[in-house]
Amino acid sequence: MADKGWKAAERRYARAVGTTRIPVTGERHGADYKTELFAYQLKIRKVIPAWLFEWLHGICSTAGKDQVGVLVLNRPRCRTGDALVVLRHSDWVDLHGEIEN
């Protein structure tokens, strides 16, 4: 039986950071893959707000040659520490990928 698309995606993204996919254990919010330092949960969606990609592209375009563009998102009156940090997967892999477990 062929893999579901999401399983193949989890394997592909896990390989990019030097690890393997964790099989589903029934935990609703469990990690899809882990490294020594990070626990990842991958979400592939048909619809993600276009403005998010536009804003990320904007900061990546203006970042210097040796800089990584990072988009920080938060809601009004929310704690600074709860903000989301978004960067391109390719930049993440450049920084943290190919890690041997």
PLM features: what roles do these ranges have?
Residues M1-N101:
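Catalytic phosphate/metal-binding cores of nucleic-acid and nucleotide-processing enzymes, i.e., regions
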